[in-house]
Amino acid sequence: EIAQNLGCLTVAIVTKPFKFEGKKRMDYALVGLDELRKHIDTIVIIPNDRLRDLIDRSTPLNAAFQEVDNVLRIGVQSISDLISVPGLVNLDFADVRTIMEHRGDALIGIGVGFGENRAVEAAKQAVNSPLLETSIVGATDAIINVTGGTNLTLFEVEEAAEVIRQSANTDINTIFGAVINENLNDEVIVTVIATGFDDAREQIGGGLDNSLPQNTSYM
């Protein structure tokens, strides 16, 4: 609330309780979300139950909770990196504010692709992560950032952007960035922040092919 009153861009990245924690705890969380929405520009919600899609039955409990913390960290870092990491096509804070100010629910996704179709695979992973509560379907605005090595091509950048536009299923307005990272070899990383969802937005299950490997998806 203080940050909002100071005119700061306020973004919340939060989790919802596991179902096994009980209805009362979930009800408290939902009330908290409703109150939080009054004081922020944008919110990204990650249901803890979807964590099971990223771990197996042998994963220790403490490691599972560490994975939740890691997802939250990556979400925050993905926003800060868009602003702070210099790019071939730069994004700045004004771009992030344009997409995220007074926008309500948001999607933040990161995907990594390898090989011949690496850019397409990375883009599909970014919009189809099992941890995201909101599908990109119905988004009206998005930031798309593509990071690759010195061999990143114009065609790959175009392919990644087209996957995201088609997945949104709307005439989506996009702000685009591209980064050349000489430390990357075969991989391409795609980051997408999407906002502007209407009340009829679809929940996860929409979008493109969900059968892509999940072990290389950051979020």
Spans of model-derived segments:
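Tubulin/FtsZ superfamily GTPase core signature
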Residues: E1-M219
